[in-house]
Amino acid sequence: MAYIRLLRRYTVKHLSHWKLWKFTFVIFIFLIFVFLLQREVGIQDFNEEPGSPSKDGKINNVLGLVLKAVNNIKVAKPKMQIKAPIRQTQKAGQKRCLPGSYTAAELTPHLDRPPQDSNAPGASGKPFKTVNLSPAEKKEKEHGDEKHCFNAFASDRISLHRDLGPDTRPPECIEQKFKRCPPLPTTSVIIVFHNEAWSTLLRTVHSVMYTSPAILLKEIILVDDASVDEYLQDKLDDYVKQFQIVKVVRQKERKGLITARLLGASIATGETLTFLDAHCECFYGWLEPLLARIAENNTRVVSPDISSIDLNTFEFMKPSPYGQNHNRGNFDWGLSFGWESLPEHEGKRRKDETYPIKTPTFAGGLFSISKDYFYKVGSYDEEMEIWGGENIEMSFRVWQCGGQLEIIPCSVVGHVFRSKSPHTFPKGTQVITRNQVRLAEVWMDEYKYIFYRRNTEATKIVKQKTFGDLSKRYELKQQLQCKNFTWYLSNVYPEAYVPDLNPPLYGFIKNVGRRTCLDAGENNNGGKPLIMYTCHGLGGNQYFEYSAHHEIRHNIQKELCLHALAGEAQLHDCDYKGKNSRTPPEEKWELREDQSLYNAALKMCLTGNKEHPSLVPCNPSDVFQKWIFGRNN
């Protein structure tokens, strides 16, 4: 109590002091005011001139000075009262978002899948086996196989609504949360088709609606690239009318995948574009992981982990809950796309299955991209025709111009991989080579000559300059300040083996005695003997390079080397792969002055006197041991 009384006495004392000080201050200000007022108005009237301020105006000036002085003193006083905070206004174009993560209820699919019959054909992604067929059924199956290059008979008997069984992705994928800030962008799914089977096309559409959150799926755009099948006309239009988000747009003449996708993108209203082929099935939770990566950085171009749907049984190869050995995209020097295992450093970087895979190239059939970035980075090369090479072109362009390509393992989409295309090319398959020349000219710098040596058709197009106008693509490259191809090989794909830019010898290898050429034979991916075949000068199976490391390389798709064995010579994977590798003696060849190909490890020479070239004791007078390198046509 004594403490409280003391505190009260102290407070009263200081308050009285404050009141006294305040009264003194007011008197002081008043005296200043009177002094200034007297000084201003006490001036003789004869000093006034026309246009000078009146007495009232002078008095107002003095009052203004006094008030400013008082206000300055007030501002200098400590502020004891706390004001309310000023609400920050939202920036224009900035989307509102709530904290935390999306709930399962928020990510409810656009459409509920109907009840499933576990015994139905192909249920839960199981295979459908076509056995004990009647003559009519066999005829139907054969027709479908020929028309679509997959078992349309099986597909037609599997429900358009089939589910794929339990979610077998790794636990970290199933439990993955997606932040509300920044919000996941909406997407327009674009599906191009040309004479597609009814069941595969509509199963793709239904699959998207059954697995894509309603708040993210803006629309599904079906782009018809001049199909002639009657069931893809009015019947399709009538069928999709039941779904407000499904649109059908048509090209009256066959222009190909590239033009059709550009048409779909031009009418899309989603913030992102998701391209799918017309024979896919989407697994659970496929869309959110793709869009989450774009939400974080809109220069990412992201692909799902593509699973296989068997072309004969339509079995869906489901992901493993324990993770799996993933692949990434690559390219060969014939500019074809391929798959390869992840390098060790990429495997170490990824802690679990939620981590993306950085990929040098992508397949190009299934991917998502920000719509704004799609156009900023150059969409597609509009002068490329039909199909082919556009995925390699976009891969090089995205990386070299500041973007990234990723494969997202938690996003799984099944795809029917066909062994051959059922479609014809209106201008022939040379349009693919023309497309490849366009990408090589713009993005590969001096490395384009590696491709030209392997493709005589490409060399012809370059000489005749029939690849079209490239000025817009060069302008884009300059505008985006894109890096060169050396940078790409050093920073994006350092694992790539780069052949000699100027090999000592290249072309076909002709045997003097038989007047036939060394030929890799069909489907020789290594481990098979070579053959002797009529020289055609078109490259391909008869293209070889004599490298600076004294190898004889056949490197159109894989890097294969002529391997010396007792008996028939074979092509094997080349041991020399660049840095930290060497050329083994069995792969070193000496082209001697007598035109023989000599292997020092076996101390033998290559002969072409039989169907398969082989190694025999050297004989300088044997014409079957003499070889000539020649340039392809």
Per-region residue spans from a language model:
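A recurrent flexible, glycine/aromatic-enriched loop bordering the glycosyltransferase active site
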Residues: 258, 333-368, 376
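Cell-envelope/extracellular polymer assembly enzymes that use nucleotide-activated donors
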Residues: 185-190, 219, 393
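Active-site nucleotide-sugar/metal-binding loop of Leloir-type enzymes
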Residues: 209, 262-272
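A short, conserved alpha-helix in the catalytic core of glycosyltransferases
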Residues: 289-290, 361, 365-368, 372-378, ...
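Conserved donor NDP-sugar-binding/catalytic core segment of glycosyltransferases
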Residues: 281, 285-339, 404
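Acidic donor-binding segment of Leloir-type glycosyltransferases
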Residues: 209-250
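N-terminal signal-anchor transmembrane helix specifying type II single-pass membrane topology
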Residues: 2-75
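Lectin-like carbohydrate-binding module/patch detector with strong preference for beta-trefoil
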Residues: 495-633
